[in-house]
Amino acid sequence: MLTAPDPYNNFRDANQLTDILQLARLVVLVFDFHQLVKLKSFWTPALLKRITAGYPVAHFQLTEQMRVGDAAVSNWIDQFVRGRITPLPHPEKFDFRVFADGQPMYRLIQQRDAEVGLSRLIATADYPFTVLDKKTWYVTAGSLRLPWDKINFTDRPWAQRPETLHEVGSIYTIQGFDLNYAGVILGPSLGYNAEKDRLTVNLSQYQDKEAFKKRPDLADTQAAKIAIVMNAINILLKRAKYGLYLYAADPALRQRLLQAHDLGRE
């Protein structure tokens, strides 16, 4: 839901939830602060509390997710998007791996797609692109070079079209959609601080400038932008039911993830 005017989407008021509350007798609001990927739709708990003040509100906490096929992997992802790298779990019924190069990861995704379908490469928005021109924009992962996804003018979801096995999907392609296996390319905006053993975010590397359009009402825009990057990563990492494969563009992060992969097997 928008938290700022957005003429592109024909919304000119200040907040969509405010308008909905004024029009509806009953509102069922399913909310996840970790799925917000643009400043124009960025919420904080304080903002949600302020907008709903004066209305009777009942809260229900959803505690189970049905997408990622293993709780230990889901917990690992939760730690990762908070900046921590822990040893990778290696459950029997979920294939979780880190790759030193994108090419073997892509070959495995192709194999999985032949076996069970719905297996695709997806990436963070760290590689240049524009939406409406006819130029082909590419994502690189070591020796791998594949084009970004194209605008989908069909009724079929991106991952269900066979030709998209040879593309790299984005957050906008895949959000809200399930995969069986996902190969995730973590681009150069995500790095690693060895001294602190923590993830770092380099906002200058993030190519989705539309996500960062100005919000004058946000007190800490820098923190909100970092949250948006990590939210996008959270979404990408939680698409797959049976297997998740990782490649990191940053050499230090890639090495740390490979180490975490091996530590998980000890």
Locate the predicted segments by residue.
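A conditional alpha-helix N-cap/helix-loop micro-motif detector
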Residues: N9-D13, G102, R161, K225-I226
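C-terminal accessory regions
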Residues: L26-V28, P162, E167-E266
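Short, well-ordered beta-to-alpha junction loops that form the rim of enzyme active sites
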Residues: D32, A125-P128, A249-D250
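Short, contiguous acidic/charged loop-to-helix segments that flank catalytic cores in large enzymes
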Residues: A4-F11, V37, F153-P157, Y172-I174, ...
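Conserved helicase/translocase motor-coupling segment
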Residues: L36-T44, G54-R198
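Signature of the SF2 helicase/ATPase Hel1-core->accessory helical subdomain module
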Residues: M1-Q61, A194
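Acidic/glycine-enriched edge-of-secondary-structure segments
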Residues: L2-Y8, P89-F96, P216-D220
